[in-house]
Amino acid sequence: MSNGMKENPLEALYAFFEEGTKETVVFDLEWNQNGYAPNLRMPHEIIEIGACRLNERGEVTDRFSELIRPRLYRRVDKHIRQVTGITEQELSSGRTFPEVFADFARFCGDSAQLITWGRDDYPVLRRNLEYYMQPSPFSPPLDAQLVFGFAHFGDAHRQMNLHAALEETGTQLEVPAHRAVYDAECTAALLPAVSTGLEGLGEEKRNELSAILEREKRIADSVLRSRPTHYSVHTDALRDDAVTNLLCPLCGRKMSFAVAWFDAGRDRYEAIGRCAQHGQAHGQMHLKRGTNGYLTMHQRVFLASDDEVKAVSEAYRLFLLTPPAKRHHRLCMEEVRRVSERQNFPSKKG
């Protein structure tokens, strides 16, 4: 082109899009919460959806922006109000989430590649949909933040925030920060730089990135569960099937354990479950202590690759080889339950 611009500045990025993609939609969410008394079915309530549609040259051709009247958390968290400027008065005149989401889904269409900056938006969107008993019509979006980190720094886990990435790439865009549609526009403005970074990758690196993105999609489609308990210590929680059960991310049935829950470090538990119909899944669980002193279980379960099963199995083998005195109080479910049985303290079956 005579002006030196590429005819299709997103060409290298398209190689990582879903097959059959006809359009590109970048979206961003703002959400509210109550850190003191969260509803565990929907700990983060979406209060704004913003998006922009792009043509093949990466230019914004249409925008979507709407505030949402909250159902659970009517008072806007102080930090969220400071960052976004969104007020309770503005939200009170908004439409409900189901109404706004229906219009957003129509805006996206049936064959758009969705893109976000970061991995947080899609799980929050799914939990909001589940709260209203609606299925997600979308496949997991492409995480532009992850691709940017991999393409520019060789590290998919190097997470640069949106506005730092704009500065890093010299991308100029004069829009207010931390409102959904403007953050979506900022992400869209970065996509040519993301795509340019991919152009220099060899086949081996491209395959590595494809594998990372495939795993991220499986994680994005996780079964997410949160459950309050009346336990103040991990040993009690690990005896309760209602806390430790693994549910298949596809059919929702209870799975058997191929690798039982064990503390992989920092009170983060891992397990491998087996579904007779859908194969093996990777479980991750955190037992978080609340202000009342009791533990709340937060669990994520997603389909596991063979490599992930091997890695978790090996970590468990090494855990069992470590003498208990050197585990720094790390626990595993099987040992806790064996001790309980010897002490005639049966596990709670769920």
Annotate each language-model stretch with its function.
Residues 4-7, 42-49, 53-84, 106-229, ...:
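Metal-dependent phosphoesterase core characteristic of DEDDh/y 3'-5' exonuclease domains
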